[in-house]
């Protein structure tokens, strides 16, 4: 759909009179994304689509992608290292490390299976006995991620929450880590 591509291009600094070879790397990425917006496919695969763009254009692209492209009849597969930027639009996540799938579940299942605990250093040793899958020190606290644990057991040690995907990504790739 040419109109969607032109609509996206209108929000950039690219002018119709410019030649591609005159464009900066970021502008070339914007041009590619404008072309993507015009594709009418049931499955759209994007590999690091916003690489080289500043945060404003990245945010605008993902907002426009969700508002104008996604209609519940299409699927979008995005590979990215910028998880925190797309976390709010994801329905499913797969984390792959060296060719091996380490997490493969819906976003809703993340909250069911993983719990993050922020605890004072004095309570960390007791919490550690519950076998976190990941741990890091943060100022005067220990931050731990647990898998498939009764949340009530953790509440006595500190603040519990669902980990953000970036934290879960680090936990899945690094595994248990102290320090």
Regions found by a protein language model. Name each.
Residues 9, 62, 111, 169-170:
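Conserved protein kinase catalytic domain
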Residues 44-49, 123-127, 150-155, 167:
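Short, surface-exposed beta-strand/loop "edge" segments at domain boundaries and coil↔beta transitions
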Residues 1-84, 88-91, 97:
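ABC transporter nucleotide-binding domains
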Residues 62-146:
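ABC transporter nucleotide-binding domain
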Residues 3-7, 59, 108, 122-125, ...:
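Generic alpha-helical secondary structure signal
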Residues 2, 71, 129, 154-155:
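Short, well-ordered coil/turn elements that cap or connect secondary structure elements
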Residues 132-134, 138-179:
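C-terminal coupling/interaction segments
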């Amino acid at each position: 759909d040419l109109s969607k591509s032109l609509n996206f291009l209108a929000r950039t600094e690219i002018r119709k009179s410019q030649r591609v070879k005159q464009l900066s790397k970021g502008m070339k990425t914007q041009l590619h994304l404008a072309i993507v917006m015009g594709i009418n496919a049931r499955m759209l695969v994007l590999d690091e689509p916003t690489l080289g763009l500043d945060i404003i254009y990245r945010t605008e692209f993902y907002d426009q992608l969700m508002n104008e492209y996604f209609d519940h009849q299409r699927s979008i597969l995005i590979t990215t290292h910028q998880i925190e930027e797309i976390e709010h639009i994801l329905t499913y996540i797969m984390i792959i490390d060296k060719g091996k799938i380490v997490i493969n579940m819906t976003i809703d299942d993340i909250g069911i299976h993983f719990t993050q605990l922020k605890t004072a250093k004095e309570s960390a040793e007791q919490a550690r006995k519950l076998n976190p899958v990941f741990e890091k020190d943060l100022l005067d606290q220990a931050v731990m991620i647990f898998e498939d644990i009764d949340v009530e057991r953790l509440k006595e040690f500190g603040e519990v929450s669902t980990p953000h995907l970036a934290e879960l990504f680090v936990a899945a790739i690094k595994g248990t880590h102290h320090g």
